[in-house]
């Protein structure tokens, strides 16, 4: 990690952290800085330690929160930690005009941090796997998928991105429970696969992998440490 990225973290007034699956982020942060993340006790949403405020939020919301708070409090140094896939999901949303220019972010994968898994297209056992592999190839009509990553899905077939033919709609965009609905409806799902245990235990098949996911540092674009 460069001194710039290290300074981003150590000079931050507020650091936003995921409130679930915290271990990869705490481990990565401890390996590159001297920051000690305090334990979150009871139902407190934030803790102050050594001049910094630590706030726990949903990991998927970190990019938007960092951009919004930094825009509202320009004199503060706001930094977050999130999965790299949520950063891409947020940034791809900006391409559709949903995000104001002062809500743009930058992110940096933490070097040497362990992979958190990969975003992949998975199919339940009720689906003809080989037929679906052909249908999601570039050049075919986009196949609808159930997902928590609608922007990744919609942009997956565009030039320079993942080159897969999939899409999504609001009724198939969830905040969780993707595999269950995919199984019930006999549809493909686009989701984060960590260890693969859920995929195996529920007889899903991985059709294609879109990207590896790593712990990432999130800042507002143009922020100067």
Placement of each model-derived feature along the sequence:
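Domain-level signature for soluble enzymes in the chorismate/prephenate branch of the shikimate pathway
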Residues: 1-225
């Amino acid at each position: 990690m460069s001194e710039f990225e290290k300074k981003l973290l150590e000079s931050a007034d507020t650091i936003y952290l995921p409130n679930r699956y915290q271990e990869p982020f705490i481990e990565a942060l401890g390996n590159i800085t001297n920051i000690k993340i305090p334990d979150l006790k009871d139902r407190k949403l934030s803790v102050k330690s050594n001049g910094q405020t630590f706030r726990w939020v949903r990991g998927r919301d970190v990019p938007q929160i960092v951009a919004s708070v930094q825009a509202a409090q320009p004199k503060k140094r706001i930094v977050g930690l999130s999965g790299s896939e949520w950063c891409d999901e947020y940034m791809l949303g900006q391409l559709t005009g949903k995000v104001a220019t002062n809500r743009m972010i930058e992110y940096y994968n933490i070097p040497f941090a362990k992979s958190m898994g990969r975003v992949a297209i998975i199919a339940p056992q009720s689906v003809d796997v080989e037929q679906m592999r052909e249908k999601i190839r570039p050049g075919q009509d986009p196949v609808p998928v159930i997902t928590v990553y609608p922007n990744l899905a919609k942009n997956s077939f565009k030039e320079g991105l993942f080159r897969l033919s999939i899409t999504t709609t609001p009724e198939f965009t969830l905040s969780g429970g993707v595999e269950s609905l995919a199984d019930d409806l006999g549809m493909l799902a686009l989701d984060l696969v960590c260890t693969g245990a859920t995929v195996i235990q529920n007889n899903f098949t991985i059709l294609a992998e879109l990207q590896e996911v790593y712990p990432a540092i999130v800042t507002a674009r143009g922020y100067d440490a």
